[in-house]
Amino acid sequence: MPGRLRPAIPCTIWRRVKPSGTQEEGTHEMKLSTDRILTTHVGSLPRPPELLALLEARETGREFDKTAFETRLAGAVQEIVAKQVAAGIDSVCDGELGKISYTTYVRHRLSGIGTFRGGDDDKPPQSAAHRDLLDHPDYMQRLNEARRISWFSREVVPCCAGPVAYSDRRPLETDLKNLTAACTAVKPVEAFMNAASPGVLTKFVPDRYYQDEDAYVEALANALKEEYEAVVKAGFILQIDAPDLGSARHNQYQHLSDEEFLRIAERNIAALNHATSNIPPEAMRMHLCWGNYEGPHTHDIPLAKTFDVCMRARPAGLSFEAANPRHAHEWEDLRGKKIPDDKILIPGVIDSTTNFVEHPRLIAQRIGHYADIVGRERVIAGADCGFATFAFVNNPVAPSVVWAKLAALAEGARVATARLWN
């Protein structure tokens, strides 16, 4: 069960006022589509096999060559940033190459995070599985076999076992250094770096210490504040990955009503706003999704229900799924929404779970729907979610197809630009 179903930290609604204590040094505002539609994606990209082998050794506690790992990681980031620029992506990142996943990487940075062994004697609650997959156990079995993984079947599962604090900046500094060097070499239009939201960690790093979800979320927010501010101070746009505002409804909180879930979402937004209180909104974006897997998705909470809560988050940009068959229609639902003038929409216009390569004209049509709602300058073309969310999962989209999709995204943005600036 969740905690007290109340915001642990007061919510704030963004206004265009620079907060006191704002990080000035190194900060950049998110680029707008002032004279053409800009392109980006969500973060994770296919990791090179040799890097995967080193990552697996590190995660499982086996001996590995740390110098070889650092050297290969730096080279891989150089390569992947250059590939993004060559594909026509404007706002690039490090592909999350040095992270095991977008959430559990925190065990290398936060104190109080221990591990337990996953498996038959320590299974997670049924709510760890998506509700739509529980409706279709035959498909769930097929999906797990295809991924070569089942829920919590990895050897090492992180959990909160003590007071949470940011204790080791070295992995963060390595990521910042590698992305800085890669961007210096190829000079992209913009670069961003991912970080987990406080709320999403309550699912992927289960609490065994605080025994109160509100207290745990607040502790995570206080700890992650250091990472968030460091990313922005280094000159990158901060992307906070917050599927706790979407997919958590049909897994972690599937036993609750929509109204109860939205109160939890409000609490998580309040924690996120607290953690980013020293960062200008225009230096941040937030990613919302409903689970990066091909499946029925019949229990996804509609965007229309969670959108107003998302608008109360401080980050100026909102990245969200808008290409897959369960959410591609939802642009219609935003036409009647009050969207603050300074919010930037980053709809997914390519699907991250299928090997179909979208036609550039379809991508342009999707971009046009959102440009009609908020204006062309406030739309950036993105992807639904990451292409390599978990390092050791057999991700559905083949690496060569990932790059074909990103090239199609760039071409679709050019087609949309020709239409919108004609």
Protein language model regions, located:
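Basic polycationic patches enriched in arginine
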Residues: 4-6, 15-16
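Short, Lys/Arg-enriched N-terminal segments with co-localized hydrophobic residues
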Residues: 11-29
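Domain-level signal for soluble alpha/beta catalytic cores
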Residues: 23-422
